[in-house]
């Protein structure tokens, strides 16, 4: 937008310098000096070079952004919505043990897999794999309800089945074994009677650890749109050493955020986990910030160069304005924007 203004100013200044020197033969020379000073090399690369650098980094992490417009839309938000799979991708949630109380293990696994699948949480894949290895099948569940305390309930064959954390079970009046040392256990009850305890282990992934610390450092707030009652800011603090100042909204908000979709896509994630997601968010902010700084630097360089060239041509100091000196001057002014653009992918 500013480039046509500078070009028009260069033409006007070139004409004024020619009129002042009263040498019409120098009009073309004055115009060439003014135009060369105004059309700096930094203008074409203020957006293109940072975008190229950021896009190359995102490609290595398995993600891509929809150009500068997509990055601009992403950087406007200072929060990211994280689901179960973002924080604990497949393979990081494992079963450490199983204890059954008065029921067949096949029935227990079938009921647990059914409730985990109904909750659509990160536990569903774990229990689906457990069910497949046991050779069982999921039951039909009705009247599925989610509870703020960290669990889900439903009816299977007319019986009330609850599936969730220890705190959830106590809130629902289910008696649990004494001296229970499980911090991330999952419990299953039928008609108010505990029938199984699953020791679930959450292993921190290195890429998620890096992503959470990067989000914390960049002051981007994670919003936990999780369905697994065990995944809380306290769990993140234990596993990753930081909760990144995560927001843990009410259940209704978490469910709505986890189901939200269908909007205009601004980025593409080709790998699971939080790292490519965080790379897109951080990269978009870096891209927009670098493009803004480079634009300001190019604007200042063009302004200073135009005014200086106008002064030198106006006073007739043509011995200073050699092609070589003008080229060096333009390159030096463009260097600051070039360095900023080249460092845009360092974060």
Model feature map: region roles:
Residues 1-79, 227, 267-347:
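Hydrophobic alpha-helical transmembrane segments
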Residues 71-97:
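Asp-based phosphoryl-transfer active-site loop
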Residues 74-77, 148, 180-182:
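Short, small/polar residue-rich loop motifs at catalytic or cofactor-binding pockets
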Residues 90-97, 164-168, 198-202:
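Short beta->alpha transition motifs characteristic of CBS
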Residues 96-108, 173-174, 205-214:
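A short, polar/charged loop-to-alpha-helix boundary motif
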Residues 156-159, 191-330:
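Conserved ATP-binding TGD loop and adjacent catalytic N/P-domain core of P-type ATPases
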């Amino acid at each position: 937008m500013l480039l046509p203004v500078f070009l028009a100013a260069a033409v006007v200044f070139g004409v004024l310098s020619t009129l002042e020197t009263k040498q019409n033969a120098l009009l073309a020379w004055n115009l060439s000096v003014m135009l060369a000073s105004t059309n700096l090399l930094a203008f074409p690369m203020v957006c293109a070079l940072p975008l190229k650098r950021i896009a190359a980094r995102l490609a290595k992490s398995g993600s891509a952004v929809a150009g500068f417009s997509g990055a601009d839309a992403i950087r406007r938000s200072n929060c990211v919505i994280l689901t179960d799979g973002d924080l604990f991708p497949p393979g990081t949630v494992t079963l450490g043990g199983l204890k059954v109380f008065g029921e067949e293990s096949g029935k227990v696994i079938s009921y647990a897999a059914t409730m985990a699948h109904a909750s659509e949480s990160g536990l569903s894949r774990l229990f689906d794999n457990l069910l497949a290895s046991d050779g069982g099948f999921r039951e039909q569940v009705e009247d599925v309800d989610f509870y703020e305390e960290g669990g889900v309930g439903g009816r299977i064959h007319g019986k009330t089945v609850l599936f969730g954390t220890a705190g959830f079970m106590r809130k629902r009046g289910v008696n649990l074994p004494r001296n229970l040392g499980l911090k991330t256990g999952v419990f299953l009850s039928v008609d108010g009677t505990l029938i199984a305890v699953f020791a679930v282990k959450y292993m921190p992934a290195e890429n998620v650890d890096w992503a959470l610390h990067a989000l914390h450092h960049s002051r981007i707030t994670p919003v936990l749109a999780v369905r697994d009652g065990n995944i809380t800011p306290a769990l993140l603090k234990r596993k990753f050493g930081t909760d990144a100042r995560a927001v843990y909204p009410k259940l209704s908000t978490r469910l709505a955020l986890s189901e939200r979709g269908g909007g205009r896509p601004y980025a593409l994630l080709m790998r699971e986990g939080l790292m490519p997601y965080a790379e897109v968010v951080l990269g978009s902010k870096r891209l927009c910030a670098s493009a803004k700084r480079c634009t300001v630097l190019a604007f200042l360089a063009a302004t200073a160069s135009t005014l200086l060239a106008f002064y030198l041509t106006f006073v007739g100091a043509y011995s200073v304005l050699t092609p070589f000196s003008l080229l060096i001057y333009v390159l030096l002014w463009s260097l600051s924007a070039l360095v900023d653009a080249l460092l845009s992918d360092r974060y």
